[in-house]
């Protein structure tokens, strides 16, 4: 079979103008970036609001079992399903996140799908796209630079600062600067560093750190903002530091919020692209699901729902991660409601979740992972059942998509389908979209159309008025199946301070490992009788949630010993090779 990049290059494409025209988008609301991608104006949403009689489309939320390093094919299934819906005559498009350069050059690779179910051109999708990540990185670091500059000048001028500048002293506490710097790259050396070293003119010496751009609060804000006015207001609320009295200093107080918003003006517009079968795709924002809220943007979803009958969107990692955050954060803030949930499962992924196989990086895969092994698969299906029950907890019908591989036996596929239905899925279908494109997802598409007609009633895990401590406990007990939380002394103090300051109404965004339903990546299948340690709690006032770190979570990844960049190169003809 051809490589992903070879398939991408051979796929027939519409010009971006023709693709937009097919969706009924006026030419003046499209800003082309090259031949096959373009920005869509937010005026599209205003036009839709002026036509109240128009019926909005139905949203399909794609999640998965607990992911493994092998990959379950969630993006392939998301794109394949959108193509499959078009294949059976149901107009559809997809909304997905923009890839981060960190994983592209690290281990995971790109995030454009794969095979015959991918966004094309895949190299443009995976590398820079329309520059949104760079704009966001610049806006984030502008705030960091402004904060350190203000600290420097207030320190240098002392009591004369106000008289010399006409500005009120912010009295920044250098030991309590909350806003890190950011970079869209895996770079472990930037997790802890000292800045301001050198002469007095080189700034105030202090400890600093970097997070990857996808983990920035600004990325969460971009994904959750409803329009430019909302984006500006959210950025103004960002808490950058504390003063010497322990009071927050915001981006508004630093007078940098307006300039940050200016840098993000174009990044607020979703990017229109297409799949290998010319199905439209809106690509926008890119928050990770393990260290952020893990869903594409509110604006892209709303725009797509006005343009077509079915919109397929993807929530990051398993249902305990991106799906939970979709409902308890994204839905809670935006009101966007899916009609059904699709859970992606693979035979090999469920075998890996059985806990019976020894799978280690750099070691040969166990023979039973790639050959028929019904007992191991049956044990691993407990993980599938847990995710089905977890998704149904939110009040929606669940369809299981079995992403099939050539190594799967008929007996294994039959067992998986049977277990899915017994666990409460309203439908289950085998998808071969990777090999066959939309035709390979047609049965899945029919099951999804049927599920979207079923009655549903959204149920969230906790009400707004519940305390932050109670929300954390509820999330662990009901969202992960654990016994409760273990708060560090630091987390205790932080939660008490947030409650006293009136932030109890916000939802919780837990940063934890995606490789287990629990906080421990070694606990496979369906862990029970565990308590989740919460090391630290942070307020994301602009994004509108409280961020809790469950254990030693890295918000700046590092490159592994065998990074993907080793295989990426470019020929004299300008064609990129080795990108996956």
UniProtKB/Swiss-Prot annotation:
Family, similarity comment: Belongs to the formate--tetrahydrofolate ligase family.
Alphabetized GO MF terms: ATP binding; formate-tetrahydrofolate ligase activity
Pathway(s) per entry: One-carbon metabolism; tetrahydrofolate interconversion
Catalytic reaction(s) noted: (6S)-5,6,7,8-tetrahydrofolate + formate + ATP = (6R)-10-formyltetrahydrofolate + ADP + phosphate
Domain of life: Bacteria
Source organism (scientific name): Aeromonas salmonicida (strain A449)
EC number(s) stated in the UniProt entry for this protein: 6.3.4.3
Intrachain disulfide bonds: none
Keyword presence, Ribonucleoprotein: no
Claim: tRNA processing is one of the keywords in the record: no
Gene Ontology annotations of biological process type: tetrahydrofolate interconversion
Protein name stated in the entry: Formate--tetrahydrofolate ligase
InterPro entries: Formate_THF_ligase, Formate_THF_ligase_CS, P-loop_NTPase
Residues given in the record as ATP binding sites: 68-75
Gene designation per UniProt: fhs
PROSITE patterns: FTHFS_1, FTHFS_2
Keywords: ATP-binding, Ligase, Nucleotide-binding, One-carbon metabolism
């Amino acid at each position: 079979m051809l490589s992903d990049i070879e398939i991408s290059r051979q796929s027939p494409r519409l010009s971006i103008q023709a693709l937009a025209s097919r969706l009924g988008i006026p030419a003046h609301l499209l800003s082309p970036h090259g031949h096959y991608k373009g920005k869509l104006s937010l005026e599209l949403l205003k036009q839709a609001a002026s036509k109240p009689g128009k019926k909005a489309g139905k949203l399909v939320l794609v999640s998965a079992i607990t992911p493994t390093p092998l990959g379950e094919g969630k993006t392939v299934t998301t794109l394949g399903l959108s193509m499959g819906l078009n294949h059976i005559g149901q107009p559809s498009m997809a909304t997905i996140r923009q890839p981060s350069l960190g994983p592209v050059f690290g281990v995971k690779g790109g995030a454009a799908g794969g095979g015959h179910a991918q966004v094309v051109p895949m190299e443009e999708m995976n590398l820079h796209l329309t520059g949104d990540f760079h704009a966001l990185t610049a806006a984030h670091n502008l705030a960091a630079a402004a904060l350190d500059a203000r600290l420097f000048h207030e320190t240098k001028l002392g009591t004369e600062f106000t008289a010399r500048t006409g500005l009120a002293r912010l009295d920044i506490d250098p030991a309590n600067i909350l806003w890190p710097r950011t970079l869209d790259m895996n770079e472990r050396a930037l997790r802890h560093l000292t800045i301001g070293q050198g002469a007095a003119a080189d700034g105030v010496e202090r400890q600093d750190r970097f997070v990857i751009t996808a983990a920035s609060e600004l990325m969460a804000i971009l994904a959750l903002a409803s329009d430019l006015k909302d984006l500006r207001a959210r950025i103004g609320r960002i808490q950058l530091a504390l003063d010497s009295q322990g009071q927050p200093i915001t981006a508004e107080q630093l007078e940098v919020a307006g300039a940050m918003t200016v840098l993000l003006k174009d990044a607020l517009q979703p990017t229109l692209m297409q799949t290998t079968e010319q199905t439209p795709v809106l690509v926008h924002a890119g928050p990770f699901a393990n260290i952020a809220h893990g869903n594409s943007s509110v604006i892209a979803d709303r725009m797509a729902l006005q343009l077509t009958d079915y919109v397929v969107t993807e929530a990051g990692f398993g249902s305990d991660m991106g799906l939970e955050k979709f409902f308890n954060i994204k839905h809670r803030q935006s009101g966007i409601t899916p009609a059904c949930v699709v859970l992606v499962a693979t035979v090999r992924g469920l075998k890996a979740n059985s806990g019976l196989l020894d799978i280690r990086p750099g070691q040969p895969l166990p023979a039973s992972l790639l050959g028929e092994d019904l007992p191991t698969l049956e044990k691993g299906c407990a993980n599938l059942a847990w995710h089905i029950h977890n998704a149904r907890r939110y009040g929606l019908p669940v369809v299981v998509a079995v992403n099939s591989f050539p190594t799967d036996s008929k007996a294994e596929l039959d067992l998986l389908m049977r277990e899915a239905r017994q666990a409460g899925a309203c439908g289950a279908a085998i998808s071969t979209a990777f090999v066959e494109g939309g035709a390979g997802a047609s049965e899945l598409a029919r099951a999804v159309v049927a599920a979207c007609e079923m009655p549903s009633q959204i149920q969230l895990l906790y009400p707004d008025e519940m305390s932050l401590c109670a929300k954390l406990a509820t999330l662990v007990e009901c969202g992960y199946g654990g016994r409760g939380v273990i708060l560090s002394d630091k987390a205790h103090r932080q939660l008490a301070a947030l409650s006293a300051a009136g932030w109890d109404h916000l939802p919780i965004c837990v940063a934890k490992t995606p490789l287990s339903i629990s906080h421990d990546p070694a606990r496979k299948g369906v862990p029970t009788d565990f308590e989740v340690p919460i090391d630290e709690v942070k307020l994301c006032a602009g994004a509108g949630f409280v961020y809790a770190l469950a254990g030693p979570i890295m918000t700046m990844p590092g490159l592994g010993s065998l990074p993907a960049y080793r295989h990426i190169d470019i020929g004299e003809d300008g064609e990129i090779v080795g990108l996956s």
